[in-house]
């Protein structure tokens, strides 16, 4: 599709920009709404520069727009309907804006970044950290975790809040926090104007078909010893069962992390089924992104989640993890010894 055709679909309200939003945190919803304001200004300015007049909706804001569209859906089907609606908007969106921050990237947003890359929608990472990441062994300095960086069409750091500043009391501190949000909103406006005038493109997809019976293990890329131990055990068990197995190892071995992250994505794309590890306070952001990428490419997904905690709001939301992770998986297992039988069942 040509850039002008894409811009015309945006202007007609057929391809709104998906502004990803943290689901559980009210501050995340506030931030998403603020960034959407900047996004709208920028989109309208960009369309005007092309001689086009934008017609609503130019943006899609999850939680607000999903819930509003699904009034009357039966309780037991509500969260599944949200997943389907959000996924549809990512697939046809002009772009995806992903506000991320903190040391644990939000798993739902990370999944959406990966899914966008898999279906060909450019994802823009908006980081709100005052810090960057450095990695032992390579001494690389990265704005975002390597796998997320590889999936994005563009990364921007909006985290201009400087911890070294001295503040003159409560009012000065509050004023500076508000000013930082104003600056972030303005930066998003300029970025979205540029997206319309000079479209970005998702990373090129691997030109490889999945090998029948091949399984890829995404247990965090080997950053922690427990991940490496569990992945090694499952690899041995799956190979004894006759499956060809690859393992994400971006944090092991030598070479630039971004290159190793690309190798993990290529290995997942070359597999018929991807097994992801969901254990932890939240699903690791890179693992969630790889799961989204695999699902976007049409690969099967097996989610391993041994946790006992449930996230409960009532019958409409009673889950162990973000609904994007749960509903995108073909099957979820609770114990390591269930993985091999589940792989057999999924791959026939």
Predicted regions and their residues:
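Conserved catalytic or regulatory cores that recognize and/or transform ribose-phosphate-containing ligands
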Residues: 1-348
């Amino acid at each position: 599709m040509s850039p002008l055709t894409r811009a015309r679909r945006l202007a007609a309200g057929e391809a709104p920009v998906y502004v990803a939003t943290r689901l559980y945190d009210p501050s995340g919803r506030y931030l998403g709404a603020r960034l959407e304001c900047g996004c709208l200004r920028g989109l309208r300015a960009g369309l005007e520069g092309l001689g086009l007049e934008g017609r609503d909706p130019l943006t899609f804001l999850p939680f607000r727009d999903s819930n509003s569209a699904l009034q009357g859906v039966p309780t037991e089907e509500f969260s599944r309907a949200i997943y389907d609606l959000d996924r549809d908007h990512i697939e046809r969106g002009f772009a995806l804006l992903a506000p991320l921050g903190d040391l644990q990237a939000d798993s739902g947003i990370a999944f959406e970044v990966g899914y966008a890359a898999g279906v060909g929608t450019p994802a823009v990472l908006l980081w709100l950290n005052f810090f960057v990441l450095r990695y032992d062994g390579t001494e690389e300095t990265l704005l975002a975790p390597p796998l997320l960086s590889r999936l994005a069409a563009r990364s921007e750091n909006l985290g201009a809040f400087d911890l070294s500043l001295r503040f003159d009391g409560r009012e000065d501190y509050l004023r500076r926090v508000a000013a930082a949000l104003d600056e972030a909103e303005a930066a998003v406006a300029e970025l979205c104007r540029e997206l319309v005038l000079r479209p970005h493109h998702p990373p090129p997809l691997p030109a490889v078909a999945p090998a029948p019976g091949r399984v890829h293990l995404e247990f965090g890329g080997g950053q922690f010893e427990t991940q490496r131990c569990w992945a090694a055990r499952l690899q041995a068990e799956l190979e004894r069962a006759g499956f060809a197995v690859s393992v994400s190892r971006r944090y092991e071995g030598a070479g630039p992390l971004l290159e190793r992250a690309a190798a993990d994505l290529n290995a997942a794309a070359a597999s018929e089924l991807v097994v992801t590890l969901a254990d932890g306070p939240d699903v690791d952001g890179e693992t969630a992104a790889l799961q989204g990428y695999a699902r976007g490419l049409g690969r099967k997904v097996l989610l391993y989640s041994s946790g006992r905690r449930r996230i409960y709001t009532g019958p409409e939301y009673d889950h162990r993890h973000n609904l994007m992770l749960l509903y995108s998986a073909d099957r979820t297992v609770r114990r390591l010894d269930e993985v091999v039988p589940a792989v057999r069942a999924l791959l026939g």
